[in-house]
Amino acid sequence: MRQWTSCGYQFNTSTERFGELRSSNDILKDGQALSERMKDDGYLFLRGVLDNDLVLEARHELLLKMAVNNQIDDDYLINEGIDPSLKTEVDQTSYREGRAVRQLAHQGEMTEFYETFFGKQVQAFDFIWVRIVGVGVSTGCHYDWVYMGRGSKSLHTSWTPLGDVSKVEGALAILHGSHKFSGLISTYGSIDVDDERTNQKYGGWYTQNPVEVQEKFGGRWLTTDFEMGDLVVFSMHTMHCSLDNNSPNNRIRLSLDTRYQPAGDETDERWVGESPIAHGAEAKRG
């Protein structure tokens, strides 16, 4: 089996430690079954459930803005999304507030799924995380709770690839069973990155090394070659990371991270409203 890495660290790719995500398309319309599988697995992988036209519109909208900001190589077609040799840092506010991005995240199949999953009306975070992952870049192992745990205990994340994302291009990886690691959840998994009283040791990521967490707590890393229209949903205490983007074509990986909870639940004030405060000075505690 090919060796895969995250943050430069190799995964243990033995069958006991590494494998493919399980599809939940067979129970897509059964809210109770979806809830039970989430409790069992900590994630739901859904093939082709999003409207490809909406995904393409969001992708194209982002790439056009990136082209204006010199974030893609202009020697190639815009839709190729090729990583430029010269990196440019850009304020992403206009990216996450784009019409097509918000339509994909807050309407249509996405909202319909969560209404089935929760069995009630849905509230989405207003803040949308646009992930622009260049070649040689990845995300370390972490729980989402540490970034957004001040509100609903039923909050979930959607990871949406904006186009096909193979393993070699930096696919998402889920650590199966990690939502049941009570020792990790009660320590690292209980911190707030904006609270000095709880976050004196860890920071946002637990580790860059995907094998480290397995050696301490167990679990099996799961990933796949994602296709346009796919969706992964997971809980706040599901450990995840991404594989390194080693695209042979220098292609940027584009994806969205969006969050959803039952309407009426308490919300994390950092991520809702017309201008969410995010991790700024107003969010600090302690």
Task: Walk through the language-model features, giving the residues of each.
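Non-heme Fe(II)-dependent double-stranded beta-helix
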Residues: 1-41, 47-141, 147-149, 277-283
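Non-heme Fe(II)/2-oxoglutarate
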Residues: 1-24, 72, 184-193, 222, ...
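Short, solvent-exposed loop/turn segments at secondary-structure junctions
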Residues: 50-52, 130-134, 165, 179-180, ...
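Active-site region of the double-stranded beta-helix
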Residues: 120-123, 150, 162-171, 177-179
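Short, structured patches in soluble enzyme cores that scaffold and shape functional sites
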Residues: 129, 143-145, 160-164, 176
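A short beta-loop-beta micro-motif enriched in histidine and acidic residues
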Residues: 144-155, 219, 226, 251
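Short, conserved beta-strand element in jelly-roll/cupin
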Residues: 148-167, 228, 233, 259-263
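Double-stranded beta-helix
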Residues: 168-239
